[in-house]
Amino acid sequence: MNRKVIKPVVLSGLFLAALIVFSIITNQDNKDMTTAMKEATLPIVQFYEENNSVAQLHGYVSEMNITKMRDGIVPVDHTRLLPLKINTYGQKIRGIAYEIRSLDDSRLVAKGNAQEIKEKNNEISANLKIQNILGKGEEYELIVILASGKNKIRYYTRLMQTQNDDTQACMDFALQFHEYTFRDDANKFIPKYMDAATGDTSTLNYVDLSCTLNQITWADLKPEQMGELEASFKEINDSYDVITLRYVVTTKGTGGETEYYNVEEYYRLRMTESRMYVLNFERTLNQIFRGENRFITDNNQIQLGIRDKNIEYTVSETGDVIAFVQQGELWCFDRVNNKIVQVFSFLGAEGINARDNWNQHDIKIARVDEAGSIDFVVYGYMNRGDHEGEVGTAVYHYDGLVHTIEEEIFIPSDVSYEILKAQMGQLMYVNEKGTFYLIMDQKLYSIDTDKRTPEVLVKDLKESCYKVSESNQYFAWVDSDKEYKSDVIHLMNLKNASVYDIKAKKGAYILPLGFIDEDFIYGAAKKDKVMVAAAGNTVFPMKNLTIMDTSENSHSILKTYKPSRGSIGSISVEDYTITIHLIKKSGGHYVAAGTDAIMNREGDTEEKVTVGSTVTDRKETQYQLMMKNGADASKIKMLTSKSVLLENPRDVSVKNKESQEYFYVYKKGDVLFATDEIADAIVCANNHMGVVVDSKQQYVWMRARKSAQTAFSSLKVNDADKSSSSVVQAVSAMLNYRGNGLSVKELIDNGGTPKSAIENTLKDSVVLDISGCTVEEILFYVSKGSPVFAMTGTDSAVLVTGYTSGSIYYYDPQTHSTRSKSYKDADDWFRKAGYIFFTYLDR
C-alpha cells in the first residue's frame, strides 16, 4: 500500500482514539446534574365512620405547630372506637401510636397505640380505642404517629366525641346528594332542596342551590368520576355540620382526548327530627391543564377551560412568553418557539393520584424573560420531591434555555398551608438581583438567595399601616407607632430596594390606602379632625385621596379626589375601580354616608396578554389568555423541566411566632381571610357562612348560636360610678357582671377609655373590639354569656344582654332597667352611633 495513503489513515485513527478518550474523561467530570422529581413515598391515613371514609390525612415528616393545624374533624361515637386504614404504598410501618391534645396544645389529654392491627397488600387496618375522657361536643387535636425505619411520620386532625347520630346522617345525605347529581332521575330528589333560580346560569365552575337543576346535574358536560371520593367533616356543632367531598372527573374533548377536572363539593347541613335541611351546597369545577392536549383555540388563544377568572399569570416584556398557574402547576408557553413547558408540577406522568394531586400548595410567579426563564415561588405542603411531607416556601429559578429548575432557597414552616398562605400571601417578591422579600410574623424580610441570610427591614407591621401592590413590587407603610398620626409614608420599590418618602402637607396626617394596578393610593386627614371617640376607637376622616404614579420612580400625581359631601372613611379596589366609602359627622360621631367611585378607563388597554372568556353549550363559560399576537397550533412541542441536583440543602430559617393576635376566617377547611381586626373577620365569616378562630384555635365567632337568650340578670353599676355618664356606667355594669367591682370613672379620669378599662380589668378574658358589626353579628357573644357594650350616641351606651327571634334585650344603665327593641330598630339605633361595640370571651 502506498505510504502516502497509510499515513493519513494512521493519523486519523490516532485522532479518533484521542477524541474517544477525551470524551470519556470529560463525561466523567460532567455528569448529568439534573433529575426528575422524586416520587411520593409517604402513606395516607384514612378514618372511617360506619363504612364511609370521613378523613384522608397526609403525612408530615417533622412536628407541626398544633395551634396552626386546623383542617378536618373526625367524629367519635359513644363506642369511642376509631377505625383507620393506612395505604402504605410499600412503606414499611413498624408502629402506630396516637396522641390527643387540647387545641391550644397546653395539655396532653391521652396517648396510646393502635390495636387490632392487620396488614394485607400494602394496606394496614387498625383501631384506636379512645379512653373515656373526652368532653362531648368538645374539640381536640389528634396526632397519629407512624414509625417507619428511623423516622416518624405525623398526621393531624381535630377530634370530637359527638352527642348524637347526626354526623352519620349528614354524611350519608351528602353522599346521596352527590350521587344524584350524576343520575338521570335527579329531579326526584334534588329540587326539594333548591332555592329560587337566581344564580349565574352561564358557568359550571361554580354551582350552588340558586343555579338551575341542569347546572347542578352537570348540564351537557357528562363527566365520569375517576378514583376514590375524599370526604371530610370541616365543622361539627349543635346547629349544623359542614362536609366537603373532593374528587376528579374526566370528559372527552372535541378531539377525543381525555380532559381532567378537580371537583370540590361543600355541604352545610342541619338534621332535625323531621327532615334534613340543606343550608348550603356549593360545587367548584376546575380543569387540569394538559399540555399534550390541543389548547390553542381557533382564534389563536390559550384555552384554560372551565375555571375561575382569577388567573395567576405573567408575561415577558414583548408578550411572547407567558407563564401561568393552573391547579397547582406552573406552565410556560413560548409563542415564537412554539413550545409549551410543564415547569413545575407534583402530578406524576403515570396519572392523577391522591398524593400527587393534594391541593395544599400554590405558586406565585415573580418574573418571566424573553428566553423563557422564570423566577417563581412554591409555598405550602410539598406532595413529593426533596421536601416531601414538609410545609414551606421554595424560591426557584427556571432556565428557559436548558429547561431546568433550581431551588435557590427553602424556608421550612411548622404551620398548615392555609395559615402559611394567609401569612405569606400578603407579599412574596423576587427581584433580578436574587433578593426574596416576604412578610412573616408582622415583619418584612429580605433574603439574599446566594447568601441565604434573612434580614428584617420593617417590624411590628399592622394591617392598617401598610399596603402592597398587585405585582408585590411596591410596599408602602407608616411606622406602626404612628398609626393614624403619621406625616410620612415610606414607599419601597422592591425591584431595587429604593425608598421614597411621601410627606404630608402642613396640618395633615396621611395613611396608605392601597394600589390600583401599580399606582399608589393614599389619603390625608386634617390633624384636628382625627379623633378618639368616647369608646376609645380612632376615627380618621380623610379630606382627600391621592393616586400616585410609581412607574420608573416618577412619583407624579395622577389624580386627587375630594368628596363633594362628607369625608373618606375607607376604600376598596376591584379590577380597575376604586370604591370610596364615605362617612359624615352626626351628633358628634361619624356614620356611613354612601359611596363614590373612581374608574381607570385606560384599564388593561396596554396589556400584551389579557384574560378573556367564551360561552359554549357544552362547557358554558371557559377562560382564555388572549394574546395580541397569535400562535400556531399545528406544531407545538411539549417539554417537561428537570430539577438541578443540589450538593447541599438550601434551607433558610425564619422565625414565625405571631407577635400579636390574629384571627382566621375558615370556610370548608380553607382560610378565606386572616386579619388582626376581629370585626373585619366577623363580617367576612358572616358573608361566607364561615367561622372565626384565634391564634390558639379557639372559636371567637360563628353563625351558630342559641335560638334565644334570656336577658342577663344581676346587672348593676358600681356605687362610685352612678353619677357618671352612661358610657362609664355601662362599662361598670359589665365589669360588675364579670365579678370586678372597680371604679370605672377613676380609670377613665386617669386617661383611660372604655376599651382600655375593660382590657386592663378582664385580664383572664379575651377583650374584643367588634365595632363595625351588625346586631345579628354581635349576638353570638350574648349567646356565650357575655354582655356587649354598645354606643348609642356621642356619650351614651347600653349593654346588649339577651335576644329572641325578633328582638334584643338591653340594659340601660341610666334607668337601671332592661328593655327591648326589634332587630331593625336596634340596628338603626346602633348604626347612627357608628356601630361601636366591645365584648369579651372567657379564655
Cite the ranges covered by each PLM segment.
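Surface-exposed, charged secondary-structure patches
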Residues: G13, A17, V21, I25-K31, ...
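N-terminal Sec-pathway targeting helices
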Residues: M1-L16
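Conserved active-site-adjacent core of cysteine acyl-enzyme catalytic domains
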Residues: T710-R843
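Beta-propeller fold detector
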Residues: A110-N113, F281, I340-A349, T404-S413, ...
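Core segments of small alpha/beta cavity-forming domains
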Residues: A36-E99, L103-L108, L142-D220, I296-K339, ...
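A short hydrophobic beta-strand element
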Residues: Y140, E235-V249, G372-V378, F520-A525, ...
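Short loop/turn segments that connect beta-strands within beta-propeller blades
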Residues: R335-N338, D399-L401, D448-R452, N493-A497, ...
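Exposed beta-sheet edge and beta->alpha loop/turn motif
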Residues: Y240-V278, E282, D812-Q814, S820
